[in-house]
């Protein structure tokens, strides 16, 4: 899996705790979301948003097939939404993602897109 630049620093600043919920507004290949899911076990959730449908599929496959050390990762912990983070309010409402402990936007360019 692609490891995002400044992953450690980003996770330290977000400081995800067990059972918290986060929005990853620029899911990409899911590296940040995977790290958040690891730290929010057992019942924390991530709403991952990406404009590119193919990227959502890649992230979902990588996260679901990862072997990180947690007691469970089911589809109810990772919620995927195709869209632009500029519509975050509508996307969170549509997905009934009400309680949010943090929001991540990685605004760099993906080497896959270049």
What are these regions (language model features)?
Residues 3-20, 35:
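Conserved alpha-helix/loop element of class I SAM-dependent methyltransferases that forms part
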Residues 59-60:
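Conserved SAM-binding loop
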Residues 29-43:
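Conserved SAM-binding loop of SAM-dependent methyltransferases across substrates and taxa
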Residues 100-101, 108-114:
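S-adenosylmethionine
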Residues 24, 45-50:
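Conserved SAM-binding motif I beta-strand of class I
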Residues 17-20, 86-105:
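A short acidic, Gly/Pro-enriched loop at the edge of an enzyme's catalytic core
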Residues 68-87:
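Conserved SAM-binding strand-loop segment of SAM-dependent methyltransferases
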Residues 8, 52, 82-88:
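Conserved SAM/SAH-binding loop
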